[in-house]
């Protein structure tokens, strides 16, 4: 058997080991201790509802609460206030409203799904030729606010396309001459756009900026720090739970060809939802992502076509009896996968939601079928036309499956939501496009070095007679247009709750963070994800 195995030519990728070892399995005292915080009641919440408070002041407070990562405590109050303000139909052409105020209000309304138009309210900052006034370069706060607002644009909103180009160039030119904390905020925004960022990472960054504000609210700052640390302790305990589960499965030893990335998987899940009420959902999603990663590597970096034929059939039949036919190395994984979903079904049945596991399993079967197609392309040296490639690759990007499994632990997600996702709605397809093309850009060179020719970049280059640089430019255009579609689909009215829509949005934000700088931060987390993981799960904020 050993000799036969040695003769099998496998497409091994030689992935680097985990950066973390057993660090998060050791549930040290810091993670277990419940600090006896004198947990501050943030009394300035009264500002949100106080009679006579100016709309501008209330909107600025809402923006600060959201940036500090504590707005979830006041979610219902904020929604009610924004609806009331939106219903006022404020005339933003009034000279009383400066660029900073108008752009901030526009962004906040759009972030919460309100259909505020852009052409009417930003027009007064353009000249007779339709160009933004050069004098705006003296208004750094206004430029930054407009820059951030432009990322909430939808298709056809050319004024925001132009605003993004103008503010990006202007902020880059003036940033070196600004004073902190504004300079730091501008420099960070140019690297990581607020709307595309992981809310938890952005909160930690803004807390450090807010500390430098001359007009900061000291009680609010302390509240944000305490809240961050308390949530961090919860996240560390969850990470301990999934790390222990992963260790007990022992798949790292049994399947050494696969990536050992359970910590990074939890980072992804935390990016989808960080609030306390999603604790169960985070754990469930982490487990499904970790198992998917094993499947991905089995198809991409180990299995022979004969083995993958059998494994694909076994997933399709979803029966423990299929283990008898499977190659020995994959049997423990198959058994663990079935048992995981049995546990999910048993738990969700208690709340009348066992149907959710059916949708997740069917989505996984679809994913595995597409992995199988991709593996055959690789083994056969086949480069499909771009349209054929993309149809399959939108599934193998895994986000269709992960969007479905992200709702497993969300009690408010009902059958209609899962049915909606199963039909590949516009918002989901937009998310799949972002994931696919950004992943393709980041992994192109590595896959090329491994002899993989069936890549999106290669397919597009051949079909369009394009250079690599032209293909990459096109892929970024596809992603930008897809973001516009997501922004549109987040607008009200929607038959689906914000609770569901935000899962799709946050999954796309994880892509932007993970593949920042065209790096594959999941496969090689040292440069991109490691600093974030330390900030989120290791180092508390000093009070």
Swiss-Prot record:
Mg(2+) 3 binds at residues 439, 447. Barely detectable in leaves. Its cofactor is Mg(2+); Mn(2+). Pathway: Secondary metabolite biosynthesis; terpenoid biosynthesis. Binds 3 Mg(2+) or Mn(2+) ions per subunit. InterPro entries: Isoprenoid_synthase_dom_sf, Terpene_cyclase-like_1_C, Terpene_cyclase_plant_C1, Terpene_synth_N, Terpene_synth_N_sf, Terpene_synthase-like, Terpene_synthase_metal-bd, Terpenoid_cyclase/PrenylTrfase. Mg(2+) 2 binds at residues 296, 300. A motif (DDXXD motif) lies at residues 296-300. The keyword Plastid applies. It catalyses: (2E,6E)-farnesyl diphosphate = germacrene A + diphosphate; (2E,6E)-farnesyl diphosphate = (1S,2S,4R)-beta-elemene + diphosphate. The keyword NAD does not apply. It is found in: Plastid, Chloroplast. It is an enzyme of class 4 (lyase). Mg(2+) 1 binds at residues 296, 300. Keywords: Chloroplast, Lyase, Magnesium, Metal-binding, Plastid. GO terms for biological process: diterpenoid biosynthetic process; green leaf volatile biosynthetic process; sesquiterpene biosynthetic process. Its EC number is 4.2.3.-. Sesquiterpene synthase involved in the biosynthesis of volatile compounds widely used in aromatherapy and folk medicine, and present in culinary herbs. Mediates the conversion of (2E,6E)-farnesyl diphosphate (FPP) into germacrene A and beta-elemene. Not able to use (2E)-geranyl diphosphate (GPP) as substrate. Belongs to the terpene synthase family. Tpsa subfamily. The Asp-Asp-Xaa-Xaa-Asp/Glu (DDXXD/E) motif is important for the catalytic activity, presumably through binding to Mg(2+). PANTHER family: ALPHA-HUMULENE_(-)-(E)-BETA-CARYOPHYLLENE SYNTHASE, OS04G0344100 PROTEIN-RELATED. This is Germacrene A synthase. The gene is GEAS.
């Amino acid at each position: 058997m050993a000799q036969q195995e040695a003769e099998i030519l496998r497409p091994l990728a030689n992935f680097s080991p985990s950066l973390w070892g057993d660090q998060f399995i050791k549930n040290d005292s810091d993670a277990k201790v419940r600090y006896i915080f004198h947990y501050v009641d943030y009394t300035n919440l009264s500002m949100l509802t106080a009679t006579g408070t100016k709309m501008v002041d209330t909107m600025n407070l809402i923006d600060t609460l959201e940036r500090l990562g504590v707005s979830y405590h006041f979610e219902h109050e904020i929604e009610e206030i924004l609806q009331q303000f939106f219903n006022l139909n404020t005339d933003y052409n009034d000279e009383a409203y400066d660029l900073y105020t108008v752009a901030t209000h526009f962004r906040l309304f759009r972030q919460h799904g309100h259909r505020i138009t852009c052409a009417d309210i930003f027009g007064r900052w353009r000249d007779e030729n339709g160009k933004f006034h050069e004098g705006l370069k003296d208004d750094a706060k206004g430029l930054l606010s407009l820059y951030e607002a432009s990322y909430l644009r939808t298709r056809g909103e050319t004024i925001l396309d132009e605003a993004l180009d103008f503010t990006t160039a202007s902020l880059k030119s003036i940033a070196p001459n600004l004073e902190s904390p504004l300079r730091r905020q501008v420099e960070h925004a140019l690297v990581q756009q607020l709307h595309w960022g992981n809310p938890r990472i952005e909160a930690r960054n803004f807390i450090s900026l807010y500390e430098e504000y001359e007009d900061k609210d000291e009680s609010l700052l302390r509240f944000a720090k305490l809240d961050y640390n308390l949530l961090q302790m919860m996240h560390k305990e969850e990470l301990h739970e999934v790390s222990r589960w992963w260790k007990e499965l022992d798949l790292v030893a049994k399947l050494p060809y696969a990536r050992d990335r359970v910590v990074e998987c939890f980072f992804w899940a935390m990016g989808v939802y960080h609030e306390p009420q999603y604790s169960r959902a985070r754990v469930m999603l982490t487990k499904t992502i970790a198992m998917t990663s094993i499947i991905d590597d089995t198809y991409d970096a180990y299995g022979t076509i004969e083995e993958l034929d059998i494994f694909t059939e076994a997933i399709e039949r979803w029966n423990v009896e299929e283990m008898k036919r499977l190659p020995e190395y994959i049997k423990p994984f198959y058994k663990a996968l079935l048992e995981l979903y049995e546990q999910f079904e048993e738990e969700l049945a208690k709340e009348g939601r066992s149907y959710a596991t059916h949708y997740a399993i069917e989505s996984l079967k679809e994913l595995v079928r597409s992995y199988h197609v991709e593996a055959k392309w690789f083994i056969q040296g086949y480069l499909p036309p771009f349209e054929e490639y993309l149809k399959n690759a939108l599934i193998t990007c895994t986000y269709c499956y992960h969007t479905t499994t992200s709702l497993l632990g969300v009690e408010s997600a009902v059958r209609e939501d899962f049915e909606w996702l199963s039909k590949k709605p516009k918002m989901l397809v937009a998310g799949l496009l972002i994931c696919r093309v950004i992943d393709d850009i980041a992994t192109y060179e590595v896959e090329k070095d491994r002899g993989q020719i069936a890549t999106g970049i290669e397919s597009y280059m051949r079909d369009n007679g394009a250079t690599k640089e032209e293909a990459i430019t096109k892929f970024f255009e596809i992603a930008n247009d897809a973001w516009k579609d997501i922004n549109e689909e987040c607008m009200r009215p929607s038959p689906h709750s914000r609770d569901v829509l935000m899962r799709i949005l946050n999954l796309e934000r994880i892509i932007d963070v993970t593949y920042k700088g065209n790096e594959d931060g999941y496969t090689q987390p040292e440069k991109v994800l490691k600093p974030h993981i330390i900030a989120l799960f290791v180092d508390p904020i000093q009070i």
